Amino acid sequence: MSKFVFDSMLPKYPQFQPFISSHHLTTTPPNSSSAAVAAALAAAAASASASVSASSSSNNNSSNTIAGSNTSNTNNSSSSPSSSSNNNSNLNLSGGSLSPSHLSQHLGQSPHSPVSSSSPFQQHHPQVQQQHLNHQQQQHLHHQQQQHHHQYSSLSAALQLQQQQHHISKLAAAAVASHGHAHQQLLLTPPSAGNSQAGDSSCSPSPSASGSSSLHRSLNDNSPGSASASASASAASSVAAAAAAAAAAASSSFAIPTSKMYPYVSNHPSSHGGLSGMAGFTGLEDKSCSRYTDTVMNSYQSMSVPASASAQFAQFYQHATAAASAVSAASAGAIGVDSLGNACTQPASGVMPGAGGAGGAGIADLPRYPWMTLTDWMGSPFERVVCGDFNGPNGCPRRRGRQTYTRFQTLELEKEFHFNHYLTRRRRIEIAHALCLTERQIKIWFQNRRMKLKKELRAVKEINEQARRDREEQEKMKAQETMKSAQQNKQVQQQQQQQQQQQQQQQQQHQQQQQQPQDHHSIIAHNPGHLHHSVVGQNDLKLGLGMGVGVGVGGIGPGIGGGLGGNLGMMSALDKSNHDLLKAVSKVNS
């Protein structure tokens, strides 16, 4: 097959490109007339489309090769007439790019042919001119062939670059698939002390390194000889190195650790088995907390990678700066994202300053307590609400479920609140780690607890105020009762005093009455006749009798009946006393 056939097949069948760029197709054999015709036609087409600057720059490069080809053509023409006639036919067919005068001269036969030697019009001067024209035509032909060779070499380099980029994309996809498979195996198989060192193969960029080495081998094997091909090969090698670095960073699950606050807490419970057998990680299963990721924990495993793997890492880090942010975001989304979206975002670079290459010996002095062992809380109603669908039936977000705390968490929070009503940032972080809660939950719990305490104090204050008001009312009632009782006592005392006064008056009257009969007895004892007569006289006067003259004994003169009216008023007042006197007289007489 000829080069022209491959040139026509190149756009449809790019797989024939390595055969076109090989050396045995670029040079045509001198004894093949069809190959010479095809090469001449291809050279003419290439010379018509080539630029002037490219032709001028390549003239100096092709001067030595033209001279060698000229001598070879001369020898061929002298040795074989058929080859010279073939060369002349090539020159005549490719003369479309020359001037018309040259074309008219090229129509003649070669002087070495038998027809031209038998011509009677041939002279010596036209033969020299014909040789000079042949020499120029051969130079131009070789120059066009060299330009055509450069064009095909640049085209082959571009095709090689495209194939290499396709190969790079395939390698990157394979690396990503292997990374996903390795991550699934890491999550499904619990690590142990034995396979922690064997798990370094997941960290090492062996697939990417092998892919990059194969790329460099293919570049060295298929590299063209031109300057443009070497430049494209160097660009392809840089692109391949960058893609291999990105694939290595994506394939290693521990390349770029995400920033977390608590590096000693892991997301997956099975990841504590391998770390507990390492130095400085004894008993980490007591601190198992399902709320935090295992990215930084697994970074301590990557610290124990051997020196050879570290050297393999170092050769890719200089090209991975552009893809580091995207790979870190992808690894953070694929490995460790909190289910609530509120994981700590503080940098973890300053948290573990004493972590060594042998496996984090700086964490050995962390305090561990029995109450740090927590039960699984993933089955709580709060988790079902949070991890479920937030969108309601009308498209609005559902109301977030109420946070439920375990009895242990509530007890520890109450203990802390008993001593401190307000927490510092450091203490809040410690409690959040110990109770497997976030700082926001701790802060909200303390706010609610302070509000609850405020309400309790307000209720106690109201109760005390009510009790005080009750006491005041009772005191008022007691005061009123005492006043009433005092008034009653006063009244009773007044009544008693009145009774006593009455009794005293009665006693005085009785005494007076007793004294009066004694005096009357004494009078009657001395003058009984006089008393008898006075009483009888008084009775007579009281009856209003108009008797004659009464004789008075003891110095009493005779009364006149005319003075009875005046004596009646006095007798009415002395009626009582006289009655008593009559009784006394009757007693005495008896």
UniProtKB/Swiss-Prot annotation:
Short name of one Pfam family: Abdominal-A
Residue ranges, compositional bias (Basic residues): 140-151
Regions of compositional bias (Basic and acidic residues) in chain numbering: 468-481
Stored InterPro entries: Abdominal-A, Antp_homeobox, HD, HD_metazoa, Homeobox_CS, Homeodomain-like_sf
Similarity comment: Belongs to the Antp homeobox family.
Main function: Sequence-specific transcription factor which is part of a developmental regulatory system that provides cells with specific positional identities on the anterior-posterior axis. Required for segmental identity of the second through eighth abdominal segments. Once a pattern of abd-A expression is turned on in a given parasegment, it remains on the more posterior parasegment, so that the complex pattern of expression is built up in the successive parasegments.
Name of protein: Homeobox protein abdominal-A
Main location per the UniProt record: nucleus
A single MF term (Gene Ontology): DNA-binding transcription factor activity
One BP term from GO: neuroblast development
GO CC field: nucleus; polytene chromosome band; RNA polymerase II transcription regulator complex; transcription regulator complex
Start-end of DNA-binding region: 398-457
Residue numbers covered by motif Antp-type hexapeptide: 368-373
Subcellular location: Nucleus
Residue stretches of biased makeup (Low complexity): 53-101, 109-139, 196-214, 487-517
PANTHER family named in the record: HOMEOBOX PROTEIN ABDOMINAL-A, HOMEOBOX PROTEIN HOX
PROSITE patterns given in the database record: HOMEOBOX_1, HOMEOBOX_2
Keyword Isomerase: no
Keywords tagged on the record: Developmental protein, DNA-binding, Homeobox, Nucleus
Region (Disordered): 53-154, 187-230, 468-525
Residue spans of biased composition, Polar residues class: 215-225
